Amino acid sequence: MNELNFRTLDLNLLRVFDEVMAERNLTRAAHNLATTQPAISNALRRLRELVGDDLVRRSGYGVEPTPLALTLWPTVRDALRQLRDSL
């Protein structure tokens, strides 16, 4: 994994990642986040570049997470929840 610069990390990328992991479908994630599927794809591309991993791969009717995505997701989900609860 690449070293992330947290000063410039777009937190929306983590929101997208969390929603994609929860839904396992880009279109549903886009709907839930009130955006478009291409915007979700673009955000995933940017996050993939940051972490140096595919994170999810297309399958049948949605996406399947990579091992790294499965490892990262609980931490990302908890961090977003803590941030949401504190604001």
PLM region spans:
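A short LG(V/I)-centered, amphipathic sequence patch enriched
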Residues: 48-65
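Short helix-boundary/capping micro-motifs
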Residues: 18-34
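Alpha-helical linker/hinge and terminal dimerization helices associated
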Residues: 50-51, 55, 72-87
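A detector for short, charged/polar N-terminal pre-domain segments
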Residues: 1-9, 15
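Alpha-helical residues within the helix-turn-helix
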Residues: 31, 49, 70
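Short alpha-helical "packing" element that flanks the helix-turn-helix/winged-helix DNA-binding module
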Residues: 13-20, 72
